[in-house]
């Protein structure tokens, strides 16, 4: 074996170093002692990992072409690492509790392991490596969902997550086997050269799409998503809703545009149906929720529909719009979950929407930051969420102009998505109304968030404002996608 090819895997290599240092630091230190240094150490290691890999690299490959990387993949890995860093920072307050402090090292190692699996997944150029990366991410994620295993809801959420992941993996591997039977190869490039529309390949594509649809929580593959989000620790729910979803969506986009390019008319119709169902049904269910974590679960399903809307364009603009949307979604959604986690810690574990009544009077800063994040998720200008939705719509419209036979369908889907944007604004404003207008006989007391929570909120808020105003962020992603 030529070991020099490992030099082409710098992001994965640096993550392995971070994982090993975290393991030895946890192993060699006493868990009974006050380890205030542990969280800063892991966060600094993640910052070093991001700095080393922030600049897009040239297209390289390893292991006979099974592993490939390039500027666009490098940018996405940086975004995923940024999201993981924010989760680690905000997790400090939660991991300081007596019932979780002794598991702090395990949490960091599990979350780094999931990120390592996602990196392998997005760099895969072979269905086998893709599946291995996916499982590398899914197994530690199941452990994270059931991290509070002695809480009934967390154990139930973990069981449901494992069952869903197992079923989706089985569906996906069956689709891959059909594609192998039809094409005789598992390399993405080779499959793209020989694949053509036939009952076998169409069935394989549908099964593969369905398997990843479960990972992204698209309708109708969203079963138990809300239950898993509600039962998992809030910090894990935030990670699950953005980082893993972003990696799976990018991978599905790349495979559809690269491997299934000759079958574009088939998967485009499939996407249209799934996008409309995901955005519409999730919005309608979100309005009915009183539990804020279930509320954000249906919000994330709707956001997944918007993310996949970019794929309809089937061009470099699609990759740019999707990656930019994931970046904005990471900072906005994690800002919301950071506030939910902080309020939960100071309100006896309550995450009901009624507990936010009058939050502005007792904790005005948190209410203001929550409003900024919700406005960004809803696409209200001048926040970054508005620009991300604009670029997604623009990518979809460009796809309508390219694919004339399905152009009318694309315009119809974009129109439905625009209408649903108004609907999503309504249910996001329900939380704003609760914080600023509604009164409570037993309001949440005034409290000071931990320094780590303040830092996480600062990073997210700067991202919400700056990523929309600073055009070089979009240009950075666009240059990488077109390289």
Q: Could you tell me what each predicted segment is?
A:
Residues 1-483:
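Alpha-helical transmembrane segments of multi-pass membrane proteins predominantly involved
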